[in-house]
Amino acid sequence: MNMNRFRKTTLSALVALSLGATGAIANDQISKPAGAKGTGMTKAFQPKSNQFWWPDQLDLSPLRDHDNRSNPLGEDFDYAKAFSKLDLDQVKSDINELLTTSQDWWPADFGNYGPFFIRLSWHSAGTYRTLDGRGGGDGGQMRFDPLNSWPDNGNLDKARRLLWPIKQKYGESLSWGDLMILAGTVGMENMGFDTYGFAGGRTDDWEPDMVYWGPEVEMLASDREEREGKLQRPLGATHMGLIYVNPEGPKGVPDPMGSAKNIRTAFARMAMNDEETVALIAGGHTFGKMHGAHKPADCLEAEPGGAGLEEQGLGWKNNCGKGNAEDTVTSGLEGAWTQLPTKWTSLYLQNLLGFEWKQTRSPAGAIQWVPTDESLHTSVPDAHVEGKKNPPVMTTADLALKYDPEYRKIAERFLADPKEYQTAFAKAWFKLTHRDMGPKERYLGNDIPRENFIWQDPVPKADYKTISDKDVKKLKADILDSGLTVQQLVKTAWAGASSFRASDLRGGANGARIALEPQMSWEANEPETVKAVVAKLKELQEDYNSRMFSKKKVSLADLIVIGGAAAIEKAAADAGVEVSVPVVPGRTDATQEQTDVNSFSLLEPTADAFRNYYNAEASYRSPTDMLVDKADQLNLTVPEMTVLLGGLRSLGANTGGTNHGVFTDNVGTLNNDFFVTLLDMGVKWRKTDDASVYEGVNRSTGEVMYTGTPVDLVFGSNSELRAVAEVYAYDNAKTRFVEDFVDAWTKVMTLDRFDLRHDLNAKLAK
């Protein structure tokens, strides 16, 4: 779905909201104002995609995004090297100076931009979701639509403009992705909070990610509940255009307990438990304020994506009063949570738990809460008007922490122990802002916490010498002599390496977690096959390591990859093509204690077309769409996806040993029969009673020759895929096919080897 196609809407009863605010975390977003340009219409002379005419046609564009040709820095740019030239202390000093240097065109609340930048950081990182790893701060995606124009990101375009002089000063050495996270972290430190550190390494993207943000076609709509009211997979937010939930309550209903349910779901889907959730909400709402001085529909013009050229990328032009300062309109909610909005205190928890609250409405008409004790209504200084006093406020979502029994226990504990509260928030903030960065080895800078967190999927450093190419060659021979079959070795190597997700850089072959729970028991991985291969390879590992006297060892992770390479070399040779499959050793083995079973369970494939595996109950898209999704997560191009699937079919790598798509009489050899057969006009395909299976019959005799699934037949049906398939079906394509397969296979085996790449950016590996 093209999220840039917004339908024109007026202000609805729902004033768009999530869990923070301009001043804090996530609350300052707005309803789509009258006059917004995002209409979802096609402009004159605009070319129409094939999906416009045939919506069910497979969209391959995710496999063509983030091309290096979009990168003005060039494919050889080394961000890690550029970042190393930074004086990070000087960058922080520059940010600190900016924080208290208020600009007339966008004055700082309470004289400090810290809360504003905290919200920027939160919303940059807060789109991350665990189910598919998409979203997050890596890439600096908030610079681009649709995120740039989401209602929840209202006025954050100004935050980035405030930071532009710093970005301009440091140029390519400081990415927008890093700067947006660093600004909020420094903002906290400026206001007296002791953070847990900061790591650079977020390489900038140069175009928006293609992400499914929900089924809705209007901003702030919510049509994403499945059976039993569960939030549709893989989404994390409850409304289109929001980071998390509606702070006024579920679909605008001021129900704190209902809000608690939504909060628990949304935060769990961004990898946060109850304690982290309370720490983040309470800690974030300690700072700053929300903005609803006027009704958005009466004041605001179009979001950035719909604004005129003269606005130069800025949106939400405010035509009421000053247009900023005390007239600022963002979410429609208005006010600060604490009496000291630019200081780290426990006042948020004191206010929340200690006061009784009554429902009211902001000047914009949004539902919010103020203390029943009216003597408190003059306890909060105004952000801009000297001498004016206001009441502290809470949202319905804030009150969820008071009324939900589990959240309240945590909040009371934090209030009683400020040190525990501070530590919990510091760790949760670091996790929030670094969760999508992948392994710790990608981190840059001198402010990285020494502590290893289990959510970083730690892999130990080798305390031994790495094996040589000569050792690899010998081990290949030993593995082939071990009695393990080509299919067993290929399946296990693929199962381990293909767990990689480019979206959040989790999974992969390193760590040999295929030999640990939960991965060993995943249905798609054929647990019995994995156990047999792992057991045999461990025998070889023990034998090899016991014979070495030079402190040289081989890891199980390397052995699994070596085994797959050996199997492919044999399969290619059996097909008449001699080839060497490269292996770069250096992987190490994680332990079960270093593996968060619940967290890793989210990586379990619900579909893997390369193994002809599809779980209809768990998958949220069609088999062919899941094929593209899987290929996208593996950073494959269209040709790489094509050659890998065809080769794996000939190798007999299907889960469960099914024959669907195995269009060859020479199973276990690396041949191009899949493509030759699929394009053979002597074979006619027809549906069966099982909608997921097709039969290929001899066009002359009617004899059933093969069976296939949608992910097999799409390579002959889709015109783009057929064009590529033809190349591999040529009479002289045997060698090209094998060489291309080996290249694509090796790419998958090394996707998580960031030590072998300088760009740090998996997205640009295409």
Curated annotation (Swiss-Prot):
Top-level EC class as recorded in UniProt: oxidoreductase
Post-translational modification: Formation of the three residue Trp-Tyr-Met cross-link is important for the catalase, but not the peroxidase activity of the enzyme.
GO CC terms of this entry: cytosol
Binding site for heme b: H285
Signal peptide: 1-26
Pfam family, one: peroxidase
GO biological process, one term: hydrogen peroxide catabolic process
Required cofactor(s): heme b
Record's catalysed reaction(s): H2O2 + AH2 = A + 2 H2O; 2 H2O2 = O2 + 2 H2O
Tryptophyl-tyrosyl-methioninium (Trp-Tyr) (with M-270) crosslink residues: W122-Y244
The record's free-text note on cofactor binding: Binds 1 heme b (iron(II)-protoporphyrin IX) group per dimer.
Active site as annotated: H123 (proton acceptor)
Annotated site location: Transition state stabilizer: R119
InterPro entries xref list: Catalase_peroxidase, Haem_peroxidase, Haem_peroxidase_sf, Peroxidases_AS, Peroxidases_heam-ligand_BS
Keywords carried by this UniProt record: Heme, Hydrogen peroxide, Iron, Metal-binding, Oxidoreductase, Peroxidase, Signal
CDD domains: catalase_peroxidase_2 (cd08200)
Enzyme Commission code(s) on record: 1.11.1.21
Cross-link Tryptophyl-tyrosyl-methioninium (Tyr-Met) (with W-122) mapped to chain: Y244-M270
Quaternary organization: Homodimer or homotetramer.
PANTHER family assigned: CATALASE-PEROXIDASE, HYDROPEROXIDASE I, BIFUNCTIONAL CATALASE-PEROXIDASE
Function noted in UniProt: Bifunctional enzyme with both catalase and broad-spectrum peroxidase activity.
Similarity-based family: Belongs to the peroxidase family. Peroxidase/catalase subfamily.
Protein name (Swiss-Prot/TrEMBL): Catalase-peroxidase
Native source organism of the sequence: Alteromonas mediterranea (strain DSM 17117 / CIP 110805 / LMG 28347 / Deep ecotype)
